[in-house]
Amino acid sequence: MDLRGTRITVHDMTLRDGMHPKRHLMTLEQMKTIAQGLDQAGIPLIEVTHGDGLGGSSVNYGFPAHTDEEYLGAVIPLMKQAKVSALLLPGIGTVDHLKMAHELGVNTIRVATHCTEADVSEQHIRYARKLGMDTVGFLMMAHMNSPEGLVQQAKLMESYGANCIYVTDSAGHLLPDTVKARIGAVRAALKPETELGFHGHHNLAMGVANSIAAIEAGATRIDAAAAGLGAGAGNTPMEVLIAVCDLMGIETGVDVFKIQDVAEDLVVPIMDFPIRIDRDALTLGYAGVYGSFLLFAKRAEKKYGVPAREILVEMGRRGMVGGQEDMIEDTAITLAKAKQAQGVAA
């Protein structure tokens, strides 16, 4: 398909999804420096919150270095052209968090639910629309629902007032054909004026290919992160996506070289470990497991002596979804006891 002249909005995840591998401990200075670099490179929309969204600070998800208010309050006044978004998961974030974000100047709110639970987003989507915000319905773990099932969920979010719907590959499990099937079905079912977005992860090295497939099928908002900084093997690497789009004639408004410099000079130096497709991140994609489970599984491996890969495969078998981080330790204990029993029996 010839995509020359197609215009998309790239949405940066470095300062939100990138909080997962940083254990939510980015400093205000790191946030500000990276956000300014992204702004200068031409990124139009930048997400800033705890990795698990507004209100994510907790024992279950991890305590950040600063509050959402502090991060948003530091970044928003510095932006010259970029708008700032925030993620909100009903059950973690509340309407009060949403109100706070709006008062601080957040432009876009993305209300995220599991891909079969759009009904829990109604209150938050309706309130965001009442505030006049750019309101996005964000259907996570999209591989766990059929194209037809996603259509029904997307239409619910649209009926609540969402002006954009995202098909979200939280596990990095989808392939270009399965992305096209889902995006194409949802695009055909929504109102023409409702935008469609895609959020990819790079666990099977498909982030860029899947994003291009999504654009071919009608998505106009695409998520990515500088140097791929994000959960699992990271998000779609922004600098690669921008280069590929430029070669294909897809218009992003982002400077090809400036975004490379942000990735190389600002983001890579703050990584606590390389964002790459190691065997555990690959297992996330292969088994269809929620991306932010990775570090929890690695910690459980050290504590219980059960390989992270085995924990992740079992989590996939059980069909665990985002928000069930507490079950990772339980799964590790169960597997450790089973190994111990096998050892005794032997």
Curated annotation (Swiss-Prot):
Site (Transition state stabilizer): 16
EC number: 4.1.3.39
Residues binding Mn(2+), per UniProt: 17, 199, 201
Keywords: Aromatic hydrocarbons catabolism, Lyase, Manganese, Metal-binding
A Pfam family this chain is assigned to: DmpG_comm
Any one biological process term the GO annotation gives: catabolic process
GO function terms (MF aspect): 2-isopropylmalate synthase activity; 4-hydroxy-2-oxovalerate aldolase activity; manganese ion binding
Keyword Metal-binding: yes
Residues that hold substrate according to the record: 16-17, 170, 199, 290
Catalytic activity reported: (S)-4-hydroxy-2-oxopentanoate = acetaldehyde + pyruvate
InterPro entries: 2-IPM_HCS-like (IPR050073), 4OH_2_O-val_aldolase (IPR017629), Aldolase_TIM (IPR013785), DmpG_comm (IPR012425), DRE_TIM_HOA (IPR035685), PYR_CT (IPR000891)
Enzyme class, broadest EC rank: lyase
Domain of life the protein comes from: Bacteria
Annotated Pyruvate carboxyltransferase domain residues: 8-260
Catalytic residues identified in the record: 20 (proton acceptor)
Disulfide bonds: none
Family listed: Belongs to the 4-hydroxy-2-oxovalerate aldolase family.
Name used for this protein in its record: 4-hydroxy-2-oxovalerate aldolase 3
Organism of this sequence: Azoarcus sp. (strain BH72)
